[in-house]
Each structure stands twice: as C-alpha cells, then as structure tokens.
C-alpha cells in the first residue's frame, strides 16, 4: 500500500481539523493547525463550495487519514462492515477502532496511530499471550494486549504512557499502566468515538 510521504500537518489543514498524527506535538503550541487552521496552498484561505459528492469524498478521505489506511484496505473494511448486522456506518467505525494499531494508541502505548503501526510491526506487543505483528488485526472483547518484556524500556513507549492521563483512555478499554497491558472490556459504542466524523456520508458515497 502506498503511503503519504509529505507533511502530515498539511493533512490536518486539508481536512480542517486536528487528526492527531504527530503525537504530543498536536497538544502543544507548536501545532501547525492551531497556527494556520486553513487549507494549504495558494488559495487555501478562500472559501470553497463543494458538491454533495465532494463533501462525501472529503469525509472518506478524512477518516482514511485519521486511521492511516489506504483506499484499497479502506474499501475492504467498508465491505466487511456492510456485510455485518447493524448500522453500516457505526460498524465501520467500530472495526477501525478495533484495529490493533489503533488500540495500542488508544491505550496510550504510542503517541500516534502511525507510531502504533510501527511498533506492532516490530513485534512489541502480544494479544492473549501470542505474538501479533499485523496492524490491521481486529481486537475482540476480552482480549488482553500486552507489551513484551523487552519493550518495556523503550523510551518512546514510556514517554507516551506518561501522557496518557492528559489524553485519556476510552471506556471500552482498560489500561494497567504498571503491568504494561490493556484489556478490551467491550466493543466501542458510537458515543465512544468523539472525533467529528459523519460516517453516513461515507455510506452514501460507497452506495453510489
């Protein structure tokens, strides 16, 4: 899957919201979005009118960027959500939240989803005592996500855990900070996902 290699701060400005792609920097006064909260480019400060399709497309792109997922993989996740019982849009967000790279970020082990993806791939975590190095692995209720013994001294992880109080942990997860592990207490409900996402726009886009 191809990866965006430009400035991640430009992505926040493009979507007109903080995507929290740079960890602690997003919470500091160094955040580019706080200083320039308008789209990048020569005409960024002009007000643009979008068609219904354009609005739907922007919403999909925003969610893709939040979770760091390419178009092909995002479409696969949407099809899975559409095939399951329940409201498609809410199921889509639940699947995205339950990705392992997102869960380790939500638990506070990493400062961003990008860093979470990196550490998962490099075998820093186990799920129910077994090695899992696939960022897209879908976590289930009752699963225990634990940091490997050798990884407990990784500075980036300990630094991130020190800021977890400020960021907070969702109600569907429980962090044992001293034990370097987290428990999935249940499935994420729609109200647990506080990002300004209009998932119905994505459903409408893919229904065309």
Curated annotation (Swiss-Prot):
<keyword id="KW-0687">Ribonucleoprotein</keyword>
<comment type="subunit">
    <text>Part of the 30S ribosomal subunit. Contacts protein S5. The interaction surface between S4 and S5 is involved in control of translational fidelity.</text>
</comment>
<dbReference type="Pfam" id="PF01479">
    <property type="entry name" value="S4"/>
</dbReference>
<protein>
    <recommendedName>
        <fullName>Small ribosomal subunit protein uS4</fullName>
    </recommendedName>
</protein>
<dbReference type="InterPro" id="IPR036986">
    <property type="entry name" value="S4_RNA-bd_sf"/>
</dbReference>
<comment type="similarity">
    <text>Belongs to the universal ribosomal protein uS4 family.</text>
</comment>
<comment type="function">
    <text>One of the primary rRNA binding proteins, it binds directly to 16S rRNA where it nucleates assembly of the body of the 30S subunit.</text>
</comment>
<keyword id="KW-0699">rRNA-binding</keyword>
<keyword id="KW-0689">Ribosomal protein</keyword>
<comment type="function">
    <text>With S5 and S12 plays an important role in translational accuracy.</text>
</comment>
<dbReference type="InterPro" id="IPR005709">
    <property type="entry name" value="Ribosomal_uS4_bac-type"/>
</dbReference>
<dbReference type="InterPro" id="IPR001912">
    <property type="entry name" value="Ribosomal_uS4_N"/>
</dbReference>
<feature type="domain" description="S4 RNA-binding">
    <location>
        <begin position="98"/>
        <end position="168"/>
    </location>
</feature>
<dbReference type="InterPro" id="IPR022801">
    <property type="entry name" value="Ribosomal_uS4"/>
</dbReference>
<dbReference type="Pfam" id="PF00163">
    <property type="entry name" value="Ribosomal_S4"/>
</dbReference>
<dbReference type="GO" id="GO:0042274">
    <property type="term" value="P:ribosomal small subunit biogenesis"/>
</dbReference>
<dbReference type="GO" id="GO:0015935">
    <property type="term" value="C:small ribosomal subunit"/>
</dbReference>
<keyword id="KW-0694">RNA-binding</keyword>
<dbReference type="GO" id="GO:0019843">
    <property type="term" value="F:rRNA binding"/>
</dbReference>
<dbReference type="GO" id="GO:0006412">
    <property type="term" value="P:translation"/>
</dbReference>
<dbReference type="InterPro" id="IPR002942">
    <property type="entry name" value="S4_RNA-bd"/>
</dbReference>
<dbReference type="GO" id="GO:0003735">
    <property type="term" value="F:structural constituent of ribosome"/>
</dbReference>
């Amino acid at each position: 899957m191809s990866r965006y290699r430009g400035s991640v701060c430009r992505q926040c400005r493009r979507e007109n919201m903080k995507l929290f792609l740079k960890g602690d920097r997003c919470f500091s006064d160094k955040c580019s979005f706080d200083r320039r909260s308008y789209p990048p480019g020569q005409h960024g400060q002009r007000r643009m009118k979008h068609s219904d399709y354009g609005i739907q497309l922007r919403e999909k792109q925003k969610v893709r960027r939040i979770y760091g997922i390419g178009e092909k993989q995002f479409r696969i996740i949407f099809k899975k959500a559409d095939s399951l019982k329940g409201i498609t849009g809410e199921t889509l967000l639940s699947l995205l939240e339950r990705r392992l790279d997102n869960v380790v970020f939500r638990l506070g082990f990493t400062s961003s989803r990008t860093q979470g993806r990196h550490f998962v791939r490099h075998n820093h975590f186990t799920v129910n005592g077994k090695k899992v190095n696939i960022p897209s692995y879908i976590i289930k209720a009752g699963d225990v996500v634990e940091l490997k013994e050798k990884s407990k001294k990784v500075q980036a992880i300990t630094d991130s855990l020190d800021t977890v109080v400020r960021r907070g942990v969702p109600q569907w997860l429980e962090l044992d900070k001293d034990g370097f592990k987290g428990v999935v207490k249940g499935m994420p409900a729609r109200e647990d996902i506080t990002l300004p996402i209009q998932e119905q726009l994505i459903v409408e886009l893919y229904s065309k």
